[in-house]
Amino acid sequence: MQNLLDPAILFFVIGVLAGAVKSNLEIPPAISRFLSLYLLMALGLKGGFALSHSGLTANVGISLMATISLAIVIPLLGYWFLRRFVSGFDAAAVAATYGSVSAVTFVTAVQYLENQQVAYGGHMAAGMALMESPAIIMAVVFANTLRQKASPELIVLGGGVAAIGHQTIKQTVSIGKILHESFTDGAQLLLLGAMVVGLITGDAGQTAMQPFSGDLFKGMLCFFLLDMGLMAARNLPQLRGKSPVLIAYAVLGPIFHASLALGLAFLLNLPAGDGALLMVLSASASYIAVPAVLRYALPEANPSLYFSLSLGVTFPLNILVGIPTYTAIAQACL
């Protein structure tokens, strides 16, 4: 209940309500983009400053390996399960969306841990960056395999059916191109670059940047979550007519993924704060980076399916309920 009284969460609720009543409240796209980049830069700096104190320890390496492992296992399990209920292309797209991560969910979780005075490792921001790409690469591999097996006469495109030639179907999306775009993505570069800056500059850099990256952080997060609330509410109508199995997956899948993360954190003896963030990362779903890549990497998949599930169902649940729940469980078990 205390989490629901946090200003950032209340602004998210305001955004949801405004979107639900079809208010003309709107955050200009350019400002929304700036807020996103600001939060990533501030998060990277915060992680870098923390690493400058703790150093690159064995615990850091173990935590990062845990994030990579989950980034591989989660989309594999998701694809295996979803193939029973939707087309292979839609299964690959949804599995990639839920196998990747939401930066805003992670930022909100970091803020929650700080409010609760729960210690966590700054290196978990690097873990977030590492978890974004594996799911995309695996989805492209799945899709390329499906294209090779597809009929030369027919293929599904974004929920519709189109007749195309044999040669077109044999074309596949280049893994190299996907890798390049994943690792040169501006948001990831900014996050990792800011972390390096924080690591190099240490206490002096933290003092210099505090008025911008520290004092303004909460207010910027409130503004951004207001925008996310508007987007979530406006994407909910797209869920009408969708399979109940997919809705259930959007609710229960993240809980299962968080359980996997909890088990791994317990086996690796991770601290409660790191374990909570690992659970949040595993339970989150991408609604910006992955959908943007999937639109051209998997044109056969239905964008309204994977986008509306992640933003309309999973994101609000994680923000309102998931983060405090996962934190409490991590504190009790780790």
Range-by-range predicted roles:
Residues 1-17, 29, 56-220, 224-228, ...:
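Alpha-helical transmembrane segments of multi-pass small-molecule/ion transporters
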Residues 20-37, 52-53:
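Membrane-interface helix-loop junction between the first two transmembrane segments
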Residues 24-31, 83-84, 178, 236-242:
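Membrane-interface helix-boundary motifs at transmembrane edges
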Residues 33-35, 187, 242, 246:
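Membrane-interfacial loop-to-transmembrane alpha-helix junctions, especially the N-terminal start
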Residues 36, 42, 68:
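Metallocofactor- and cofactor-centric catalytic cores in central/energy metabolism, strongly enriched
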Residues 39, 43-47, 224, 228-231:
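Helical transmembrane-bundle signal
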Residues 49-52, 263:
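Membrane-helix exit/interface motif
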Residues 233, 238-252, 262-272:
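Hydrophobic alpha-helical bundle architecture
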